[in-house]
Amino acid sequence: MVDSHGSDTECSSKKKKEKTKEKGVYRGARMRSWGKWVSEIREPRKKSRIWLGTFPTAEMAARAHDVAALSIKGSSAILNFPELADFLPRPVSLSQQDIQAAAAEAALMDFKTVPFHLQDDSTPLQTRCDTEKIEKWSSSSSSASSSSSSSSSSSSSMLSGELGDIVELPSLENNVKYDCALYDSLEGLVSMPPWLDATENDFRYGDDSVLLDPCLKESFLWNYE
């Protein structure tokens, strides 16, 4: 009788272990009767526990527990996913609200898209996606700025060309015409009519002679004839 009872106990314990493995139970995660998973962690040196939330999968509850364990116990914490320790968020402070917020954020993170052993430089998926978005945005903004600068330079060159066509000043050397000839005083004075020489009071003062403008003299000559 004793032997049969002992064998029954061993069989029941093995069944419990197998059932636990099938359910995928993690540290700090418990399955409710309605199928949801809850996560909680005991506060250090206290009997109370911090409620981390209710989640649809065991993995989400396990990640929430890992965040809380890292926040409270640090490097000595026993984690469900030690390979994710560097990628999990950290709470702003050790208050219960901040730990719950960080745990909920970790539960919503998706680590199934790309296997971690295939990722280069141990970069988390979310961080790499954000980096790719930033690079695409920076490249598009740089191309837009270069196109705007080229368009502005072309428009400025067109504007300067139009202004050059409109504002075209005449050449002073080619267009200015002299109606009167210039006479060098060393080549001699232009001979004036006799009646100009006779009017001493009007055009001569002592020994100095007043030189008239050639145009004025020409008008006098026409009047004289």
UniProtKB/Swiss-Prot annotation:
Residues 1-26, 134-157 are annotated as: Disordered. Residues 25-82 bind DNA. It holds the Pfam family AP2. Keywords: Activator, DNA-binding, Ethylene signaling pathway, Nucleus, Phosphoprotein, Transcription, Transcription regulation. It is found in: Nucleus. Its main location: nucleus. Residues 1-25 have a biased composition (Basic and acidic residues). It comes from the Eukaryota. Expressed in roots, stems, seeds and stamen. Residues 138-157 have a biased composition (Low complexity). Induction: By drought. Probably acts as a transcriptional activator. Binds to the GCC-box pathogenesis-related promoter element. May be involved in the regulation of gene expression by stress factors and by components of stress signal transduction pathways. PANTHER family: ETHYLENE-RESPONSIVE TRANSCRIPTION FACTOR ERF042, ETHYLENE-RESPONSIVE TRANSCRIPTION FACTOR ERF042-RELATED. This is Ethylene-responsive transcription factor ERF042. It comes from Arabidopsis thaliana.
